Amino acid sequence: MSRSPDAKEDPVECPLCMEPLEIDDINFFPCTCGYQICRFCWHRIRTDENGLCPACRKPYPEDPAVYKPLSQEELQRIKNEKKQKQNERKQKISENRKHLASVRVVQKNLVFVVGLSQRLADPEVLKRPEYFGKFGKIHKVVINNSTSYAGSQGPSASAYVTYIRSEDALRAIQCVNNVVVDGRTLKASLGTTKYCSYFLKNMQCPKPDCMYLHELGDEAASFTKEEMQAGKHQEYEQKLLQELYKLNPNFLQLSTGSVDKNKNKVTPLQRYDTPIDKPSDSLSIGNGDNSQQISNSDTPSPPPGLSKSNPVIPISSSNHSARSPFEGAVTESQSLFSDNFRHPNPIPSGLPPFPSSPQTPSDWPTAPEPQSLFTSETIPVSSSTDWQAAFGFGSSKQPEDDLGFDPFDVTRKALADLIEKELSVQDQPSLSPTSLQNASSHTTTAKGPGSGFLHSAAPTNANSLNSTFSVLPQRFPQFQQHRAVYNSFGFPGQAARYPWMAFPRNSIMHLNHTANPTSNSNFLDLNLPPQHNTGLGGIPIAGEEEVKVSTMPLSASSHSLQQGQQPTSLHTTVA
């Protein structure tokens, strides 16, 4: 039934069905006693019940006692009055809600962020798990690009991130607030909303996805502009943080733990694996000059030992495929919300500081071994603030030119030469003059036929020559060290480089034969006199023999003589 206004302020209702009387029922009185009911109830009593008046218990007549239908003029007048009253009622409500136009209500699940660069002003980007999506499930993200001011870094954008849970919103605020991204400081707080203009006018809002309020909000969360300028809404935010901290003291640790789990606990040294000169893939995050140094460096920093499935580091990089714009000039997976870049946000007064996971010494790289200084990719960091070393850029004092050789190899060879010289100097005094004189008494000097050969008289017996050659390795151990260099009895002219040849030529007397240097000192000619009938190794010789030793290493010749065998390179000529 439609509502019908009466002369009174409140509409007349049927006493039986408690429904407002229609316009036609206003002048309907079925009983002579004057008890007024609606025509619906009158018809029901007469057809389904006893047909008696509920007031006087008299039977209802066939026709109502009083019934005066309204004319068209009266009906139009009543409708106009009804419409006017409705307008007055709406106006009264609008006047009562007019003050709500300047009221803002804090939304517990809404995060308001300012200072975003234009590159990050994308709802789909901010919804990703490596960005705001890491703190909880997001209901909606709205970007506001109509920022009226622009700083030195260009215009910035703001964003409204609506979470499903209020706890996730508070966690995001604590992790994002006061962080520097792209040279801009992000500011995050609980967002406020206003009342819908249709709600203020007491009208139906035509927008199905309207984000404004269409009902009265919490009185404790409602603040006027003056109260917000005084910081009342921030006090309310701190109050919510205190309540959440009391219920769950580790609510911040939950988010941090999940980040470390996804990143495999990467350290700042494991963050980089690509060159930082890619402006489209990297950001500069840092404080002051650190950010400038990172952005200006063109040197890529290798990962210090952790496989890059997440890097830096990590950045380990099981999750390096997704790069957060909140990360530093580094391209790996460490998010702006990690502890390395978090700016301390105020903790609610009266509360102990948030528990933080202790830093173990194992989290920092140890000093490498000396031999690994030129091969290890890990650069030791003296302090956590030494970002140049942490990022692997090295010191600016280090020479940048290439030496072209291995310093370790050159030093090792030079040291070996020095040791060799020292040993040769120690062996020279062992050649005493007495031994040289005794040796010379058994030799004679003679010039044999042909130039360029040394002739020697034969020793008294064959065993003396063998014993003489056996002395050579003992007297001159350096000779064996260089035996692979020479293929004959060759004496190089540079005695300084080979100190084992620095002894006098008469020291060859230990060979029990006369050694006369000739113009060609590359060979020795051993000429045996004819009176001996026994040659080297006990081989009988019929006449004078000329033994020419050539193209045989000294060590091989002496070894064969010691064994009593005839060397294969000895050529015997019978005169």
Swiss-Prot record:
Q: Which residues form the RRM domain?
A: 109-189
Region described as Disordered: 256-370, 424-459, 553-575
Q: Which biological process terms from the Gene Ontology are attached to this UniProt entry?
A: protein autoubiquitination; regulation of megakaryocyte differentiation; ubiquitin-dependent protein catabolic process
Q: Which UniProt keywords apply?
A: Coiled coil, Cytoplasm, Metal-binding, Methylation, Nucleus, Phosphoprotein, RNA-binding, Transcription, Transcription regulation, Transferase, Ubl conjugation, Ubl conjugation pathway, Zinc, Zinc-finger
Task: Cite the residue ranges of zinc fingers (C3H1-type).
Answer: 190-217
Spell out which residues are annotated as carrying Phosphoserine: S71, S301, S324, S432
Q: What start-end ranges are recorded for coiled-coil regions in this protein?
A: 68-104
Q: Which GO terms describe its molecular function?
A: RNA binding; ubiquitin-protein transferase activity; zinc ion binding
GO CC field: CCR4-NOT complex; cytosol; nucleus
Catalytic class of the enzyme: transferase
Question: Pathway it belongs to?
Answer: Protein modification; protein ubiquitination
Annotated positions of the Asymmetric dimethylarginine modification:
R475, R483, R497
Q: Which reaction does it catalyse?
A: S-ubiquitinyl-[E2 ubiquitin-conjugating enzyme]-L-cysteine + [acceptor protein]-L-lysine = [E2 ubiquitin-conjugating enzyme]-L-cysteine + N(6)-ubiquitinyl-[acceptor protein]-L-lysine
What is the designated name of this protein? CCR4-NOT transcription complex subunit 4
Annotated organism of origin: Mus musculus
What lineage is on file? Eukaryota, Metazoa, Chordata, Craniata, Vertebrata
